[in-house]
Amino acid sequence: MKPEVLLYKSLPDDLRARLDEHFTVTAINGLSPETIAEHGGAGARRRHDRLQQHGGSSAAGENAKLRAASTISVGYDNFDVEALNQRGIVLIDTPTVLTETVADTMMALVLSSARRVVEVAERVKAGEWRRSIGPDWFGIDVHHKKMGILGMGRIGLALAQRAHHGFGMPILYNARKHHEEAESRFNAQYCDLDTLLRESDFLCISLPLTEQTHHMIGREQLAKMKPSAILINAGRGPVVDEQALIAALKDKTIHAAGLDVFEQEPLPVDSELLTLPNVVALPHIGSATHETRYGMARDAVDNLIAALAGKVEKNCVNPQVLR
């Protein structure tokens, strides 16, 4: 008898066929607590936000069937990993295939924020380009400015490569430990958070959401940045205190922001961020290319096949459950 799999996102036909070869697949409508519980997977319920968890220890205890959860993402803050650990449920993600694409998105945010690409393009469409442009249309340079990277993982390293080699930008970074490859390849300079905030012309956030990183950038941290600085966030929205960021953008504490992630997603249509001309807001498109999303789905399928065969070798979030 084939193992049973719950499929909560559609897959390309060839990948769905591959799943069907190995498993009995049931498509479900999202990952609401009720839907997961109905199918015996309480331990993998999603979190509605960082602090309110669905599928805690008691809920996971109700689950007698779930053996593995495979997510099409690099982030896993939407899973209650502690509950999964308690039940011996393996969680696998897809961290490697999206690295270059997300770094591209971050560099696009750097450029579009600095050169006001979205803002001035809309002005052209509105018919405001009627004579030679003046300073009120100007942006700021990117090349040779200091890039500060908060979180030097795979994506941070790929961003450093683009900034250093493509734009001649000195690289500063802060992370849990020194990154020898970043320092040797891109002459990246490790510094403490206060120094990163004070000296960066572009502060690029590439951090996961954890108890330690929630609102890591708030009013106090934003006040330490240059008035000319631009904040880029393509990590997780709640790493930045959104209300503090709005205030800093309105009172010119910082120059601008390029955002691909938000505290609430989708971003509410009445969000004050959408009223600010110095904000570039994207709908969490960091990895959203046809090629990369296919690769992520392929890896998620491969991960699940390996996990249910007891052969997980990579991309395991909680390898301790395999021991």
Swiss-Prot record:
GO-annotated molecular function: glyoxylate reductase (NADPH) activity; hydroxypyruvate reductase (NADH) activity; hydroxypyruvate reductase (NADPH) activity; NAD binding
UniProt keyword annotations, A-Z: Cytoplasm, NAD, NADP, Oxidoreductase
Highest taxon in the source lineage: Bacteria
Catalytic activity: glycolate + NADP(+) = glyoxylate + NADPH + H(+); (R)-glycerate + NAD(+) = 3-hydroxypyruvate + NADH + H(+); (R)-glycerate + NADP(+) = 3-hydroxypyruvate + NADPH + H(+)
Subcellular location: Cytoplasm
SUPFAM superfamilies given in the database record: Formate/glycerate dehydrogenase catalytic domain-like, NAD(P)-binding Rossmann-fold domains
GO cellular component: cytosol; plasma membrane
Region (Disordered): 37-62
Keyword NADP carried by entry: yes
EC annotation from Swiss-Prot or TrEMBL: 1.1.1.79, 1.1.1.81
Primary localization: cytoplasm
Active-site residues annotated for this sequence: R236, E265, H284
Spans through the membrane: none
Family stated for the protein in its record: Belongs to the D-isomer specific 2-hydroxyacid dehydrogenase family. GhrB subfamily.
Subunit record text: Homodimer.
Record's function text: Catalyzes the NADPH-dependent reduction of glyoxylate and hydroxypyruvate into glycolate and glycerate, respectively.
Name of the molecule in the record: Glyoxylate/hydroxypyruvate reductase B
